[in-house]
């Protein structure tokens, strides 16, 4: 299931050179993307017990999650992260909540692995499983946002998450936990033998790093203006989502598998005015790996990428490699992809069992 229209300023193609019916289709897709809207209520995380500091002892995730839950149960509004440094564990978004980081707000995620349990339902490299809690996660929520001019820092480095990829140049040493020690192969075997998803319980010892932001079966989503740094794994991972806007976001993460934004089996997506400076693909379109992708058979479709800058990464706009559910209607316009650090501008990854 393939239909792609890629139009990049890099290639010197003028808007007028492309058949107008193609642009009209992208305009119709954009009209289908629902916009978030929130009541005027504001919930400051300090009012729920969040304290500034980065000494490794004071964690703010309980206060932040309480503020989010209270806001959602009251009908929605804005959960405010004021200026200052806040050390936190995993955050769970709820419907009708805008998590807003004011300029000067610095949300730093701890690398203490025990904080990211119990596991949650997700996908890891296109395979369904229960894995470590993403740093920011939502399941089945609607009308949610992460906005503001603050910084969200996963604090991943060779000293913690990145070494789990199993590569010595990312800090791995013999005897350390790593995905190559059997965890990744175990997950792939679960999928190929059609093991029930609730039996696919991955643990820290399996070495499968969590995403920075993972939104699962959510709709009407906005991620705007924030800076995202140092992700353990993929940075923005919408999964089975619909009506997503990613606007004005700066991504800076040079670890292994630090994809910038990976819409997976998602529909009606706009990514615009963003800067991607990554250790892997800047944007990668996905729809599941092998058996799991074919089982759900949900393509990624109606995706618009425009006015973005790809400064570093394996590929600017990439399809795959986990693309077994197919993809269609991908529009790329006026993106700057001329950095000497960018390996490829457009890349389609495929093989005979995965699609693409």
What are these regions (language model features)?
Residues 86, 151, 336, 351-352:
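Catalytic metal-binding/acid-base residues of hydrolase active sites
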